[in-house]
């Protein structure tokens, strides 16, 4: 029998494939009937098992144009529901949804029907068991443990930013009159402020001889190489995410060395927190994340992993937000002028700057600053696309039937991808000028009822704990920039929209090249 199968493989294989497809179609129809679902209204197929579409996703990342391909090259239709296959999971379909009710169901009302899938496995070499990698009870425990930390740090965080801003300002003044990449400086600024917030001591990546400031000669925990190693490790995580089932192929020596150095650095501060006496912990001046967290848990790996999870979010999202913000301010002089007027009325400008009045509460009172940050996050969300994996056979409320108003089936193990970027640029929610960068829209009644059409910090139970942290940091830096400099200018020729680089978060592929005065 075996010999016959081998001999006639060219007959057996197509037959097995056909039988599998027939059974799958029957099983799908049966599930649709049980769950009251209808066929997907709009589908995108490449007629070659999803390989072509999957290759587009991978190649688009190489060209650093992932966001543009998703918005322009894929069909934007009324219900924005299509099915495409992602390499290498060629047997799993991925439904891409763009309807508020579907996103709400995915992230909130049907939260328990979906999980993060392989994220824990993909990210574990760097991030371990943390709030951004865990599902289920592990995630619930992490969130309960971390939530208080982001309620207590708000006021203290503002005052701790000024020393880092002074270093940032020195770099900018050094380049005054010439063009330079401020995005690179923002990434250094945010890693400095984030490590001080987390560990009580900054990596001081902004300190260098070009501004007459030097790091300590003693570097026994890898402080000098920490930021670069953390960046490189994240690049590998992004690749592991893209290749999914073949993640184990992305595990070379450079990746392992970066993880080792990052862990060594973090373990040093974890151990220092564990060695501190209760009296020493209470006497600490200012807020330190690790010193507060060690009061709740004594597990070294827990402390390290949670710290790195928070660092990933707190550093990269803030740097990206600031970079896109300055890009738009330099591209739109009238917006920069309005922002400076708002800052002047609240905190003064130049020599009349009242830095001591910049607080968590006073930043919230800056109406135009708030509108500007909202618009920046709308047009440039930190995580433009995300996905969830169905943990059981279920449905989403919209996208099926001839009119798109019927539920659609999502089978267990299937990936549901939702595009924050395309939702944020949808004229249905933001009007005919949705593609235009216009902060004033946030003072209009139409933006008060957006709900699930505006998700810069995700939504539902997994909504970002540190959103106020990010907004406060970005607001503080923009206020201080407005107080310190009169003009911002982009290096010509200006490419718009700018090319985006999407790894785990989004930034500008070519940097933010500006001139200040």
Swiss-Prot record:
Superkingdom of origin: Eukaryota
Function statement: Together with an NADPH cytochrome P450 the enzyme system catalyzes the terminal hydroxylation as the first step in the assimilation of alkanes and fatty acids. Preferentially hydroxylates lauric acid.
Cross-referenced SUPFAM superfamilies: Cytochrome P450
Listed EC numbers: 1.14.14.-
Any one GO molecular function term: heme binding
Gene expressing this chain: CYP52A8
Any Pfam family matching the protein: p450
Source organism: Candida tropicalis (Yeast)
Family: Belongs to the cytochrome P450 family.
Protein name, per record: Cytochrome P450 52A8
InterPro entries (alphabetical): Cyt_P450 (IPR001128), Cyt_P450_CS (IPR017972), Cyt_P450_E_CYP52_ascomycetes (IPR002974), Cyt_P450_E_CYP52_fungi (IPR047146), Cyt_P450_E_grp-II (IPR002402), Cyt_P450_sf (IPR036396)
Main EC class the enzyme belongs to: oxidoreductase
Residue positions binding heme: 464
Annotated keywords: Heme, Iron, Metal-binding, Monooxygenase, Oxidoreductase
